[in-house]
Amino acid sequence: NVNIDLEERLSYEIVAAVMEGTSDIGIIANSVDVADLETFPFRKDRMTLVTAHEHPLAERGNIHFTEALDYDFVGLHEGSALQDYLSEHAARIGKRFKYRVRLRSFDAVCRMVERNVGIGVVPLAAANRLKKSMKIRAIALLDPWASRELIICVRRFDDLPTHAQQLVEKIRTQ
């Protein structure tokens, strides 16, 4: 009998929880410092632009990040690993985000995008999940950096309970 408590958190919060022992397993972006944790490759994660159905960009099939930066944004809060990653790429092309609001979750970002407060960038998996219940569109980002690696992290794999080791192995083979 195994219970799984699944929480969506920012990568750096997941690393802290695994390091502190409050979480056994984490799935994070490889852009975060994992200190002494053991890591395993998981899968690629594409970033995508999300817009409200009535936004001027909504009918685009794809877009370069630099074009999107001309619009108002709904972003993740300061210190978010993903938002820092995106800000780095904006700075490399000499641009900055024009934030209308910054929030703590992909769900909250997409809810504000749905209300046409601005556009946002979220993982494609989150956009695909959320567009089932929200009136948002997902537009592919053409930039090569928009694809990032996700990794599984644990303190020490050999110290995990058997059922947790089996879960890690099952996740890795999906």
Model-derived segments and spans:
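Hydrophobic residues within well-ordered alpha-helices
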Residues: 18-19, 68, 111-117, 152
